[in-house]
């Protein structure tokens, strides 16, 4: 369920993230959430368990604590190499998570809400855990007077999960994206905001829906350009959406 400080938006965000994932990812790549309306201020998101008696979830934090990370090895490379040591290539899985987080402006991806699945009895490592827990997103913590851009964690000890400036992760670690079809983002900003209209704390705040729609659209355009530049073999920097949120969001609105 959502919190008053976040306009009770979190359950709606989980549903929106599921819609986004259904557009971009395979069915097994994400946990699908449904929005339940239990009455005013009693919204909740529900999903089927991603584990059962035969499987367990091991958070990335457990991997971080299980072995010493060399000082010259970044967090991303450490996680990828730790999984590779157990026969898992998780680069594409991480890309998918970071792309979803970027488009959702998720500011709460931490080392306890991504990881791998293992066999409960044999302890054999199974594929990476699906994307889940994307409720703290879409600027639910920001006032309308604030920019709807990226997030920076307050100190290095709170990397979310691989960089303090969260949007930097797309540029640094999403360098393949062969799985991504950006054309599937068409209409997503409208679909997301249609879901948010079910929340009166958002729908009744003048200008909030329009600002969210423009900000999502801006991110979709930036990711599409990033993907094209990668496929052309060029270097591209994902723009600073904080700096762009005033002028570029207005420009994006004209193209919605």
Language model regions located:
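Conserved ATP-binding subdomain of kinase catalytic cores across diverse folds
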Residues: 1-65
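Conserved kinase catalytic-core segment
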Residues: 9, 75-143
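A broad, structural surface signal
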Residues: 15-23, 92-100, 214, 221
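A generic structural signal for short, non-catalytic loop/turn and secondary-structure boundary residues
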Residues: 24-26, 38-40, 109, 124, ...
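ATP-dependent phospho-/nucleotidyl transfer catalytic cores
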Residues: 46-98
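C-terminal catalytic region of ATP-dependent kinase domains
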Residues: 119-256
């Amino acid at each position: 369920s959502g919190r008053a400080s976040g306009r009770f938006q979190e359950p709606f965000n989980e549903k929106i993230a599921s819609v986004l994932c259904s557009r971009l990812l395979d069915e097994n790549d994400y946990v699908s959430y449904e929005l339940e309306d239990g009455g005013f201020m009693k919204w909740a998101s529900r999903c089927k368990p991603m584990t059962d008696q035969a499987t367990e979830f091991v958070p990335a934090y457990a991997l971080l604590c299980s072995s010493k990370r060399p000082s010259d090895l970044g967090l991303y490379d450490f996680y990828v190499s730790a999984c590779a040591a157990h026969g898992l290539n998780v680069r594409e899985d991480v890309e998918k998570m970071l792309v979803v987080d970027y488009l959702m402006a998720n500011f709460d991806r931490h080392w306890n809400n991504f990881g791998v699945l293992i066999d409960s009895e044999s302890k054999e490592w199974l594929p990476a855990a699906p994307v889940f827990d994307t409720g703290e997103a879409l600027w639910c913590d920001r006032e309308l007077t604030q920019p709807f851009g990226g997030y920076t964690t307050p100190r290095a000890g709170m990397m979310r999960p691989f960089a303090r400036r969260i949007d930097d992760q797309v540029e640094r670690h999403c360098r393949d994206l062969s799985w991504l079809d950006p054309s599937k983002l068409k209409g997503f900003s409208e679909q997301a905001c249609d879901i948010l209209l079910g929340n009166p704390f958002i729908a009744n705040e003048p200008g909030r829906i329009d600002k969210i729609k423009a900000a999502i659209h801006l991110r979709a355009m930036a990711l599409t350009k990033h993907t094209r530049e990668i496929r052309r073999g060029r270097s591209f920097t994902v723009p600073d959406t904080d700096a762009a949120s005033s002028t570029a969001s207005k420009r994006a609105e004209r193209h919605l």
